[in-house]
Swiss-Prot record:
The EC number(s) this enzyme carries: 1.18.6.1
Cofactor: [8Fe-7S] cluster
A Pfam short name: Oxidored_nitro
Keywords recorded for this protein, A-Z: ATP-binding, Iron, Iron-sulfur, Metal-binding, Nitrogen fixation, Nucleotide-binding, Oxidoreductase
Entry similarity comment: Belongs to the NifD/NifK/NifE/NifN family.
Quaternary structure, from the entry: Hexamer of two alpha, two beta, and two delta chains.
Binding-site residues, [8Fe-7S] cluster: 31, 56, 115, 153
Gene it is expressed from: vnfK
Catalytic class of the enzyme: oxidoreductase
Keyword Chaperone (UniProt): no
GO biological process: nitrogen fixation
Protein name, UniProt field: Nitrogenase vanadium-iron protein beta chain
Length: 475
């Protein structure tokens, strides 16, 4: 008998935990009204009205301007002390009429609550009834939809706020129009993605010959100023698009936590079949998305989209084993982004040992099938912290966690700089690197972009911290 001993590898442990502290130190996520405002600006002829203090609008618009380098119209009821004590319903009524008078093309106003207006208990639905009567009396020839969006800042995050606003806008409009003739279109909810991602998705649908409507269509967030164009930026999604969603062939949600509930609403109310796939970060998730589209629509995947993943695989294979293998990564941000990036990292031999999710939907995360997929694919232990903040990342680094790379939005840059760890900017907001909102992160092209960004961040770090001629020794 041989004296050789077998080494039994310990199964990887994927541990899901919640931040233990009550207080938040260096938050990594924004409030619910911020997400609701982002959903609102994705619709043409729509101006969100934030029922709260001016700061609830001003600082969010600043984030949008930093990330997209564009100006967006968001209104505020400018709640002050008197309204905080005696109620702010009058501020909403005045705000709606001012917007209707000032913007003749206005067709949709999501009325977004904040922590203060939720605490004082303003009756938004009742106030909307009053506003509808006033609008009908002053503008009998116009139909302006008012959507109630309950987004108190003391719970949830920009992710839940986005999902709540999308669902409320669809519910408000589709309830009026009801079910019509089948359109044969595919509703697509990509979640909180960049304009570059929307452009890529629309190219995929065009190449497959699929008549799809992307909600919300943010392609025009990156558009030039033209003589016939307003100074304010808005999305391409129209009220007609939303109304027609009830007549679609099917709905495809690409983000479990960012808009998927609207697909469930359309299925329950109008019998529109609803499907959910993993956000298409990386090659496999993109393959799965295209197969699902083909299954739903009966369309063939064209040769161009058969060739594209092969190009991506070659590009990533040139980097994976030589440069990425066994490199430890921490990822932070909103849930669909973080879990999707973790899956991508495993495809290219990176090891996402720490995932920080800036949202508290713990019961939902436990049921997320991606956790089991990560466990099945990983050969190392992984910690997933939900309701996390950036102190969780900083503390683990200070306690000795060895990392080769950090992935997340620009608010985590100080942690990376102080720890001297290379960082790839991805997610929202990213304002300390140029042009990232134009580039896709999803799909085959997005996989190549991410791989090259990761490699270049590591290469620059090697040059500045170890050996400026390191590449000669590698090749």
């Amino acid at each position: 008998m041989s004296n050789c001993e077998l080494t039994v590898l310990k199964p990887a442990e994927v541990k899901l935990v919640k931040r233990e502290r009550e207080g938040i130190i260096n938050p990594m996520y924004d409030c619910q009204p911020a997400g609701a405002q982002y959903a609102g600006i994705g619709v043409k002829d729509c101006i969100p009205l934030v029922h709260g203090g001016q700061g609830c609008t001003m600082f969010v618009r600043l984030l949008f301007a930093q990330h997209f380098k564009e100006n967006f119209d968001v209104a505020s009821t400018s709640l002050h002390e008197e309204s905080a004590v005696f109620g702010g319903a009058k501020r909403v009524e005045e705000g709606v009429l001012v917007l209707a008078r000032r913007y003749p093309e206005l067709r949709l106003i999501p009325i977004i609550t904040t922590c203060s207006t939720e605490v004082i208990g303003d009756d938004i639905e009742g106030t909307i009834n009053v506003c509808n009567r006033a609008l009908a009396a002053e503008f009998p020839e116009r139909k302006i939809y008012l959507a109630p969006v309950h987004t108190p800042s003391f719970k949830g995050s920009h992710v839940t706020g986005y999902a709540e606003c999308v669902k409320s806008m669809f519910k408000t409009i589709t309830e009026v129009h009801g079910k019509g003739q089948p359109s044969g279109k595919l509703n697509v909810f990509p979640g909180w993605v960049n304009p570059g991602d929307v452009v890529l998705l629309k190219r995929y649908f065009k190449e497959m010959g699929v008549d799809a409507t992307v909600f919300m269509d943010t392609e025009d967030f990156d558009s030039p100023m033209l003589p016939n164009k307003s100074i304010e930026t808005h999305g391409r999604t129209t009220v007609e698009d939303i109304a027609d969603s009830a007549n679609a062939l099917a709905t495809l949600a690409l983000a479990r936590y960012e808009g998927a509930t609207t697909g469930e609403y359309l299925e329950k109310t109008f019998a529109v079949p609803n499907s959910l796939v993993n956000t298409p970060y990386g090659i496999k998730n993109t393959d799965d998305m295209l197969r699902k589209i083909a299954e739903i629509t009966g369309k063939e995947i064209p040769e161009s989209l058969v060739r594209e993943p092969r190009i991506a695989w070659i590009a990533l294979a040139d980097l994976a084993h030589m440069f990425f293998a066994n490199k430890k990564v921490a990822i932070f941000g909103h849930p669909d982004l973080v879990l999707g990036l973790a899956q991508f990292c495993l495809e290219v031999e990176l090891e996402p040992v720490l995932l920080l999710i800036g949202d508290d939907q713990g019961s939902k995360y436990k049921k997320d099938p991606r956790l089991q997929e990560l466990k099945d694919a990983a050969h190392f232990d992984m910690e997933i912290v939900h309701n996390a903040d950036l102190w969780e990342l900083e503390k683990r680094i200070n306690d000795g966690l060895q990392l080769d790379l950090i992935m997340g939005h620009s608010k985590g840059r100080y942690v990376a700089i102080e720890a001297n760890i290379p960082m790839v900017r991805v997610g929202f907001p990213t304002f300390d690197r140029a042009g990232l909102y134009r580039k896709p992160s999803i799909g085959y092209q997005g996989a190549m972009e991410l791989g090259e960004m990761i490699a270049n961040a590591m290469f620059a770090h090697m040059e500045y911290t170890r050996n400026k001629e390191w590449i000669l020794n590698t090749w």
